[in-house]
Amino acid sequence: MAVPKKKTSKAKRDQRRAHWRRQASSQAQKALSLGKSILSGRSTFLYPPAEEEGEEE
């Protein structure tokens, strides 16, 4: 017969959510910082700028 699983405690749930939010906040901060750097023109970006594909000779 099927038995329901134990309920996850509120503390464990809140701990997981806090971790996810902390990770998301960190990634958002990095993305915002990179965007500001690119827009201000003082970036040392890792990827080369996109080249036009039709300019091959």
UniProtKB/Swiss-Prot annotation:
Keywords: Ribonucleoprotein, Ribosomal protein
Tree of life domain: Bacteria
Disulfide bonds: none
GO term, biological process aspect, one: translation
Single GO MF descriptor: structural constituent of ribosome
Ranges of Basic residues composition bias in the record: 1-22
Residue span of region Disordered: 1-35
Protein family according to the UniProt entry: Belongs to the bacterial ribosomal protein bL32 family.
InterPro entries: Ribosomal_bL32, Ribosomal_bL32_plant/cyanobact, Ribosomal_zn-bd
Source species of the chain: Synechocystis sp. (strain ATCC 27184 / PCC 6803 / Kazusa)
HAMAP family, per database record: Ribosomal_bL32 (MF_00340)
Name the record gives this protein: Large ribosomal subunit protein bL32
Record SUPFAM superfamilies: Zn-binding ribosomal proteins
Gene3D superfamilies named in the record: Single helix bin
GO cellular component term of the entry, any: large ribosomal subunit
